[in-house]
A protein has these predicted regions:
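Short glycine-enriched loop/turn motifs at secondary-structure junctions
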Residues: 76-79, 207, 259
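A conserved active-site cap/scaffold subdomain adjacent to cofactor or substrate pockets
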Residues: 257, 261-277
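N-terminal Rossmann-like or analogous alpha/beta NTP/dinucleotide-binding catalytic cores
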Residues: 2-124, 220-234, 249, 274
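Active-site cores that bind ATP or allylic diphosphates and position pyrophosphate for catalysis
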Residues: 106-107, 111-241, 246-253, 261
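Second-shell loop/turn segments in exported
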Residues: 83, 212, 265
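Short glycine/serine/threonine-biased micro-segments
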Residues: 13, 19, 65, 101, ...
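Short, surface-exposed amphipathic charged segments that create phosphate/polyanion-binding patches used
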Residues: 97-100, 253-259
Length: 277
């Protein structure tokens, strides 16, 4: 029996919903409807410094205005909630501890100054910055001593030493990412907040998302997220990275091109049918 199609739209509540976001939501909604699947709305509020409390309501209002009703999510409920990412924080911590116990991740105690020195060295040597893994080599006793001293730490995901992640993108075709060029990225910040590339795939896996449809600016995040799916032992969804929207000057659509949010288009008198056509 085929796995039911489940897509999602996962905006961040950092402002008004951009027309590019609605375009992404439209593709996800259409794919779910075409395949008799379910369309999920999830709010990804991991960046607390950029969030606007009223943005969640504005996002929902904009989606409803253009006719994109969600089957699961805020206001609709569902079997795999909560659908607000910050309300799933305990689940993210649970997975982080699981990854630490399995050796898939490790604590890094490097200071901002030490990391800056590594970046400067990479720049002088004309090579991309990749974290040196100095904290990966710490013994259990050294880690315990640092913890006892109250040293701040982040959690990094351990990337395989060799090989590559090959993504069969539904839009771009096969894309290859060499593990040696990725580095061990941070999955939990020093304040305990999970990063986007950690929380996002955990939530997708828990919500049984089968198809991730999003902008091509997130393509480079994919190999890091695939490692999280693999660490969870969860199926890796199919990915489709859409071309971004550009203005007449061939630059990414922004305020300088005029109204770019759904709210602004609605207030300017545009019909919802014109926006999604």
């Amino acid at each position: 029996m085929a796995t039911p199609v489940r897509t999602r739209f996962a905006p961040s509540p950092t402002g008004l919903l951009h027309v590019g976001g609605v375009r992404t939501a439209l593709f996800s909604w259409l794919y779910a409807r075409h395949n008799g699947g379910r369309f999920v709305l999830r709010i990804e509020d991991t960046d607390e410094t950029r969030e606007h409390p009223e943005a969640i309501e504005q996002i929902q209002r904009s989606l409803r205005w253009v006719g994109l009703e969600w089957d699961e999510g805020p206001g609709a409920g569902g079997d795999f909630g909560p659908y607000i990412q910050s309300e799933r924080r305990e689940r993210h911590r649970e997975v982080a501890e699981q990854f630490l116990a399995q050796g898939l991740a490790y604590r890094c105690y490097c200071t901002p100054e030490e990391l800056a020195a590594e970046r400067e060295a990479a720049q002088r040597e004309n090579r991309p910055f990749i974290y040196s893994r100095r904290c990966l080599a710490l013994s259990a006793e050294e880690r315990a001593a640092r913890e006892a001293a109250g040293e701040s730490s982040v959690i990094r995901l351990r990337t395989p030493d060799e090989g590559a992640c090959v993504v069969d993108d539904l839009v771009r075709g096969q894309v290859r990412f060499e593990y040696g060029q990725l580095g061990d990225h941070v999955i939990v910040r020093s304040d305990g907040v999970p990063t986007y590339n950690f929380a996002n795939p955990i939530d997708d896996a828990d919500m049984h998302i089968t198809h991730v449809i999003r902008g091509e600016d997130l393509l480079s995040s994919t190999p890091r997220q695939v490692l999280v799916y693999q660490g969870l032992g969860a199926p890796v969804p199919s990915f489709a990275h859409l071309p971004l929207l550009f203005g007449p000057d061939r630059k990414r659509l922004s305020k300088r091109h005029g109204a770019t949010s759904v709210e602004e288009l609605r207030e300017a008198g545009y019909l919802a049918e014109a926006v999604v056509n």
